[in-house]
């Protein structure tokens, strides 16, 4: 039995109100929604009966799980009311979590074998458990690949079986250290049943595998050190396209040093001693950089960026043509809806900069020690170790910030209307605090259950993790 308490946030007081207009802001150019009134929650205690092994509270067992879509990957499904623990399941924190259509998945290696377990999102009941065979002792590629939205009906997993010793009669012909040639098995599973839909095999000096829709994109190293990138269908392993780089990757101490593969709906970015940007649809080369290039990643739809020590950052359009240069770097968003699409946000180290697309005019500059992490509904959430602030994407104006100082021991999350973050009561009890993105007003606050070590988003679901359990809140 577990008590879930809603902390009273009624009345007025300093702890309730956000602090507005913090940080030094310089607007270079100023181009030109209120929500429903704050709902005040009385102190309530909800006693939830939890069945061992992960059953739901009896009152909601028959109810359907709301399936309203998120605005963007990395965001929570809409949180209309204070959430409560819908179910819990035994999952060690060392296991990886991901989501698929109607299920939450845990992957693990137990006794040298790779296993995937699926729990029904609505009930917490175990749907299926699949053993995908033995794995190698070192398994950098082994795992299930999350799809962008966590809603695919296909689960794609890669397993590296134990390495077979090299045949002395066939020594390696690689002229410098490189990853050993090995093979990996790609399995496509039905998310609803766990049934194996198909298996295929990857062979070569494998460096990285990423998922793109229901396909896999594979980076391998040719015997002469050149990168090879291929896109295969996860079901059946059919080749979509193949690319070989003109420049060898940088190799060191038997590994591919600094190599990286990034994918999104528009681009495939291959980074090593040089950088190449490929069209995700057909593998055609959009641009290939000099050996001094460093590929940062896609920034927005149809726009990507590169960086070099000599030129700094360069923003490029869909064809690879240079739009403008900037010494600022490109922030790593945990969630973004890319709105508005004609404003690019850059991190200049000690300040955040807004620039227009496609011309690159500087619109505003905000001096802050906090880092941009969320971009949604025309607003930025900038996070520091002691709190966060919300700024307008078009103007750079700081709209509000969290009152006081609270250790952000987990990264703030959003559903597009609320920002959920770490909070603390006057007595020091850790809480989950929900503030309206529009104005910072506190809507509710929930105590964090004992033993919780992480609060995160998995496929749009709010998930808490202890050392040996997961708790799904709804």
What are these regions (language model features)?
Residues 2-474:
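Secretory-pathway ectodomains
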């Amino acid at each position: 039995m577990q008590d879930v308490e809603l902390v009273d946030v009624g009345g007025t007081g300093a702890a309730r109100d956000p602090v507005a207009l913090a940080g030094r802001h310089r607007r270079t150019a100023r181009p030109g929604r209120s929500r429903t009134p704050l709902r005040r929650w009385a102190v309530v205690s909800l006693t939830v009966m939890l069945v061992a092994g992960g059953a739901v509270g009896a009152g909601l067992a028959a109810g359907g799980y709301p399936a309203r879509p998120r605005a963007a990957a990395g965001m929570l499904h809409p949180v209309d009311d204070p959430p409560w623990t819908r179910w819990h399941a035994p999952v060690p924190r060392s296991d990886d979590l991901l989501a698929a259509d109607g299920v939450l998945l845990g992957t693990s290696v137990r006794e040298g074998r790779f296993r995937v377990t699926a729990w029904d999102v609505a009930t917490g009941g175990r749907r299926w458990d699949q053993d995908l065979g033995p794995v190698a002792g070192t398994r950098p590629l082994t795992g299930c690949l999350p799809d962008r939205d966590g809603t695919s009906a296909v689960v794609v997993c890669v397993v590296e079986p134990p390495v077979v010793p090299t045949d002395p009669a066939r020594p390696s012909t690689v002229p410098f250290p490189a990853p050993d040639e090995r093979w990996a098995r790609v399995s496509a599973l039905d998310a609803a049943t766990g049934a194996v839909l198909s298996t295929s095999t990857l062979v070569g000096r494998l460096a990285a595998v990423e998922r793109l829709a229901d396909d896999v994109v594979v980076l391998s190293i040719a015997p002469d050190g050149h990168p090879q990138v291929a896109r295969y269908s996860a079901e059946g392993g059919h080749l979509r396209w193949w690319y070989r780089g003109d420049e060898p990757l940088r190799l060191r101490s038997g590994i591919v040093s600094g190599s990286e593969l990034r994918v999104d709906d528009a681009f495939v970015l291959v980074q090593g001693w040089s950088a190449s940007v490929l069209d995700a649809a057909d593998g055609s080369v959009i641009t290939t950089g000099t050996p001094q290039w460093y590929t940062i990643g896609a920034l927005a739809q149809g726009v990507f960026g590169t960086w070099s020590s000599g030129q700094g950052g360069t923003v490029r359009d869909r064809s690879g043509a240079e739009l403008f240069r900037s010494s600022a770097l490109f922030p790593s968003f945990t969630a973004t809806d890319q709105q508005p699409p004609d404003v690019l946000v850059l991190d200049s180290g000690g300040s955040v900069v807004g620039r227009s697309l496609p011309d690159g005019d500087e619109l505003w500059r905000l001096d802050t020690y906090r880092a941009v992490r969320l971009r949604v509904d025309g607003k930025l959430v900038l996070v520091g170790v002691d709190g966060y602030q919300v700024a307008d994407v078009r103007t750079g104006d700081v709209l509000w910030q969290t009152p006081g100082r609270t250790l952000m021991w987990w990264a703030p999350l959003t559903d597009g209307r609320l920002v959920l973050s770490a909070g603390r009561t006057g007595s020091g009890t850790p809480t989950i605090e929900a503030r309206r993105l529009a104005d910072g007003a506190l809507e509710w606050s929930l105590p964090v259950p004992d033993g919780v070590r992480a609060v995160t988003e998995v496929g749009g679901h709010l998930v808490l993790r202890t050392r040996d359990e997961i708790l799904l809140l709804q």
